[in-house]
Amino acid sequence: MAAQNKAMSGNRMLVFVPPHPLIKHWVSVLRNEQTPCPIFRNAMSELGRLLMYEASRDWLPIITGEIQSPMGVASVEFVDPREPVAIVPILRAGLALAEHASSILPATKTYHLGISRNEETLQPSVYLNKLPDKFPEGSRVIVVDPMLATGGTIVAAIDLIKERGVDNSQIKVICAVGAPPALQKLSEKFPGLHVYAGILDPTVNDKGFIIPGLGDAGDRSFGT
């Protein structure tokens, strides 16, 4: 039965909102309009650390063996550093959410991707692309974008990653807040994708901002 459920889940996108009290705490700090910039950025970083931990559960490549402890021989498991894991923060707000990625996943490579959104048309435009021409075979990729609102930015990012040889099932998305328009687009276009969110909000306004959301994550993270 477990194998059957796993096969079924591979055909559809899954969204996870981990019920951890610290995740709820940091989301609440981010929501508060009175939270000053340094504390906002720290809260975003701490939220990213927790979501990165959850997203990497049962997903990282493992090697097993035996080692000699001071008291005897022990069976052990290590994360296999030979299997590539990549972090792709979407600039600029993704930098704060991905800040502690290396403390959770020390053997990763980080590829920056800059995508801006036209304030009138809400269409994405790529202004910086540091992705490799092709990801190494078997790469696992975590895309970090704090706000999944209309979905244009995250869809553009995943399209670029897939063009470089990564399958949907090898991509995970981390966000602080997700909303229905973005999640619907991701579900329709990328079956098998997994999304990890701090919280899900009900709607997006006509300017493309999540309601109630937390405002402009980039502006509030960097004070500009």
Swiss-Prot record:
Residue numbers binding 5-phospho-alpha-D-ribose 1-diphosphate: R92, R117, D145, P146, M147, L148, A149, T150, G151, G152, T153, D216
Binding-site residues for GTP, renumbered to this chain: K109
Required cofactor names: Mg(2+)
Annotated EC: 2.4.2.9
Keywords: Allosteric enzyme, Glycosyltransferase, GTP-binding, Nucleotide-binding, Transferase
Pathway: Pyrimidine metabolism; UMP biosynthesis via salvage pathway; UMP from uracil: step 1/1
Molecular function (Gene Ontology), one example: GTP binding
Record SUPFAM superfamilies: PRTase-like
Residue sites binding uracil per the record: I210, G215, D216, A217
Catalyzed reaction equations: UMP + diphosphate = 5-phospho-alpha-D-ribose 1-diphosphate + uracil
Regulation: Allosterically activated by GTP.
One GO BP: UMP salvage
GO cellular component, one term: cytoplasm
Record's cofactor remark: Binds 1 Mg(2+) ion per subunit. The magnesium is bound as Mg-PRPP.
Enzyme's top EC category: transferase
Function: Catalyzes the conversion of uracil and 5-phospho-alpha-D-ribose 1-diphosphate (PRPP) to UMP and diphosphate.
Family listed: Belongs to the UPRTase family.
Protein name per the record: Uracil phosphoribosyltransferase
Classification of source organism: Eukaryota, Viridiplantae, Streptophyta, Embryophyta, Tracheophyta
